[in-house]
Design a protein with these regions (language model features):
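NAD(P)+-binding Rossmann beta1-loop-alpha1 motif at the extreme N-terminus of oxidoreductases
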Residues: 1-63, 94, 125
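Hydrophobic beta-strand scaffold residues
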Residues: 27, 47, 116-117, 158, ...
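Rossmann-like NAD(P)(H) cofactor-binding subdomain of soluble oxidoreductases
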Residues: 51-56, 60, 68-133
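Rossmann-fold dinucleotide-binding core
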Residues: 97-175
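Helical "substrate-binding/catalytic lid" subdomain
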Residues: 166-288
Length: 290
């Protein structure tokens, strides 16, 4: 499989497309705003005028868009991916969406004779460029095997988890961890600073224990300094938090901590922090604790 399409060129989608181009795949890409296509075009990718055109020129189309509504928009309709099927097309959706929505979208694709996989990932643009994403995949196992070379190019670990929707559930559980880690780290730093303790000492102690995380080692010092390399915005994480709480409601389960965190992130966005990195939730805590 050499002809791969990418629909959606946000920070992650663009990085995935660049990785594939640089690895020798024939990439056709689409984005609503053309400014985001310039670098890819210079690197050798073909730029399509519609998702349909991407599908017409691809064996596999990877979707990387914001939410389920955006997935449906690029997938179905006159200029959607489904209408570009030239036979044996596979669609792989990297977007973070509700598992039940994912299953419904898979059925719509199946009705059009197209196999669809869920392939949400962990890791940002820099990780994607290096081919070091962690991928959770679900859907038809045969279709997954056909795409394995592509997936192994963008991810250093790929987990096949079963039927459609399962990978989406695991992705939501992973983003729940991210949410709580960022908030707990922010509250810990805020507490020690207000206690006249150097937060760097707090981090040194934390990172000397079993409780250290990649976030506490790689992002926490930037949180103290208020200097962020934005790879995943606070507003995007809030969108995923709402998807988590919605999925929990559908399953009939109570997740009290993420429900409270949703309120905190909503307030942070209302205070103007939505466009900074998700670890910038600490800026909201700084503001309310002056």
């Amino acid at each position: 499989m050499k002809r791969v399409g990418v629909v959606g060129l946000g920070m992650l989608g663009n990085a995935v497309a660049l990785r594939l181009v640089d690895s020798g795949f024939e990439v056709t890409a689409y984005n609503r705003t053309k400014e985001k296509t310039f670098e890819l075009k210079e690197r050798g990718a073909a730029i399509a005028e519609s998702p349909r055109e991407v599908a017409e020129n691809s064996e596999l189309v990877i979707i990387v868009v914001r939410d389920a509504d955006a997935v449906k928009q690029v997938s179905f309709g006159n200029e959607g991916i489904a209408n570009g099927n030239q036979g044996k097309l596979i669609v792989a959706d990297m977007s973070t969406i509700d598992p039940s929505e994912s299953k419904n979208i898979s059925k719509q694709f199946s009705d059009s004779g197209i196999a669809k996989l869920d392939i949400p990932v962990m890791g940002g643009p820099n990780v994607a460029i290096a081919g070091d994403l962690v991928m959770m995949a679900s859907g038809n196992k045969g279709s997954f095997e056909k795409c394995k070379e592509v997936f192994d190019t963008i991810a250093n670990k790929v987990f096949f988890l079963g039927e459609s929707g399962v990978a989406n559930s695991v992705k939501l559980a992973m983003n729940l961890q991210i949410t709580m880690l960022a908030l707990a780290l922010s509250e810990g730093i805020t507490l020690v600073k207000k206690s006249d303790v150097d937060p760097r000492i707090f981090l040194e102690i934390l990172n000397s224990t079993y409780f250290k995380t990649g976030m506490s080692e790689k992002k926490a010092y930037k949180m103290i300094d208020g200097k962020y390399d934005t790879t995943f915005t606070l507003s995007n994480l809030k969108k995923d938090i709402s998807t988590i709480t919605g999925a929990a409601k559908s399953l009939g389960i109570e997740l009290p901590m993420i429900s409270k965190a949703e309120e905190v992130y909503e307030n942070a966005i209302s205070e103007g922090f939505g466009d900074i990195d998700y670890t910038g939730i600490i800026e909201y805590l700084k503001k309310i604790n002056k």
